[in-house]
Amino acid sequence: MQATNYPVSLPDSYVHFGKHKVFNRLTNKFDKHDLVRLWSLILNCKQVLEEEIEGDFAEVGVYKGNSAVVLAEIANFVGRDLYLFDTFDGFDKKDLEGVDDKFQEGDWGGVSVDEVKAFIGEAVSCCHFEAGYFPETLTEKHKEKKYSIVSIDCDLYKPIKSALDEFYPLMSHGGVFLIHDYSSGFWEGATDAVNEFCKETGEHVICMPDKSGSAFVRKSK
């Protein structure tokens, strides 16, 4: 029997996605060194939409917009809103305590809202930028909504735990948290925040084999 070779960086579903103009735009913008994360984001968003899970999208920790552009393209395509929370000024000193006290105020800053908007491109029409310290920027207008996808990429314990705690009651049953850096081995605060959250809620982690060890948590309760 003749052996078959498979392109290991691409799932079988590429044959369908590769024909889609939205997907082609994403592969041109997303970090080419972490395509596993791109596929994980796309496939889990697709699953949520196919199951008709109610709610808009949100992201806490935007930085340059690498994952925001994925969420924006998908949200815009299906007519949902995307709420983007970030200081847009790097780490806040209020979060630099405990395991995270080794980092500096302003780390991972230097990217403006306008730069992120330009990076996202035409899909920015569905985006709402909430600049400032989270969760202070989470207002009643946000709490009146339901969410189906919440991406969290804050690196540090305090903002990650706050994002999980604040959005969990707002998340639709079956909605998905996409949390970066969980098993990176470097961002201890990310691991601690997710583990503590899961212990408190009875939810469970699904680990992804991407570059920085993302974890997904699907709301089951």
Task: Show where each model-derived region lies.
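N-terminal auxiliary segments of SAM/dcSAM-dependent transferases
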Residues: 1-5
